[in-house]
Amino acid sequence: MAYPFQLGFQDATSPIMEELLHFHDHTLMIVFLISSLVLYIISLMLTTKLTHTSTMDAQEVETIWTILPAIILILIALPSLRILYMMDEINNPSLTVKTMGHQWYWSYEYTDYEDLNFDSYMIPTQELKPGELRLLEVDNRVVLPMEMTIRMLISSEDVLHSWAVPSLGLKTDAIPGRLNQTTLMATRPGLYYGQCSEICGSNHSFMPIVLELVPLTYFEKWSASML
């Protein structure tokens, strides 16, 4: 989860988020090198007295500044496309959960079970217990098994929403009349918080998401108690 005054990303809890962090570092290094080169050239232009006012063309320079940016863009695009394909790939999910956005709460349905569904509302500030997080706690958490491929089917009953859990690298739009899907797999147990990431009305800020990732045996006990 996020911490006060945090500048970086949340800790990665899924293979997708780990890949996104590596891609961010890769891209940031390219941006740093380009920025350093530009600042170096600007400093040279400001400090040197040599000018080339009579130069009409320089084919070598033009070739370099055409080919070099193309190579840089390829170095950025290839890993980006790889991650995009990884995010769209869903192979033999062990569990499917249908998520519906409402103004202003989420509803969940475990489609592999006959009657396992519930609504998830934010707990008001005045009802929080000591140690609970303001604007992030819900009355019904989404309990899921860890280290298993889970397919999330996401849609909306009214307006545009967006189901997002940063530490898992997830952000999928909930669109009325359309069913989007994404996959998640957590590498360790814990509570993972998210929020609606699409402005959806006056209470947009009060649509938290809480995932509770547990070992499979605990999930089986929980699902049996809910039926």
From Swiss-Prot:
The chain crosses the membrane at residues 15-45, 60-87. One of its GO terms (biological process) is ATP synthesis coupled electron transport. Binds a dinuclear copper A center per subunit. It comes from the Eukaryota. It is an enzyme of class 7 (translocase). Residues 46-59 are mitochondrial matrix. One of its GO terms (molecular function) is cytochrome-c oxidase activity. It is found in: Mitochondrion inner membrane. Mg(2+) binds at residue 198. Cu cation A2 binds at residues 196, 198, 200, 204. Residues 1-14, 88-227 are mitochondrial intermembrane. Its cofactor is Cu cation. Its EC number is 7.1.1.9. It is a multi-pass membrane protein. GO terms for cellular component: mitochondrial inner membrane; respiratory chain complex IV. The keyword Hydrolase does not apply. Cu cation A1 binds at residues 161, 196, 200, 207. The modification Phosphotyrosine is found at residue 218. Keywords: Copper, Electron transport, Magnesium, Membrane, Metal-binding, Mitochondrion, Mitochondrion inner membrane, Phosphoprotein, Respiratory chain, Translocase, Transmembrane, Transmembrane helix, Transport. Belongs to the cytochrome c oxidase subunit 2 family. Component of the cytochrome c oxidase (complex IV, CIV), a multisubunit enzyme composed of 14 subunits. The complex is composed of a catalytic core of 3 subunits MT-CO1, MT-CO2 and MT-CO3, encoded in the mitochondrial DNA, and 11 supernumerary subunits COX4I, COX5A, COX5B, COX6A, COX6B, COX6C, COX7A, COX7B, COX7C, COX8 and NDUFA4, which are encoded in the nuclear genome. Component of the cytochrome c oxidase, the last enzyme in the mitochondrial electron transport chain which drives oxidative phosphorylation. The respiratory chain contains 3 multisubunit complexes succinate dehydrogenase (complex II, CII), ubiquinol-cytochrome c oxidoreductase (cytochrome b-c1 complex, complex III, CIII) and cytochrome c oxidase (complex IV, CIV), that cooperate to transfer electrons derived from NADH and succinate to molecular oxygen, creating an electrochemical gradient over the inner membrane that drives transmembrane transport and the ATP synthase. NCBIfam families: CoxB. This is Cytochrome c oxidase subunit 2.
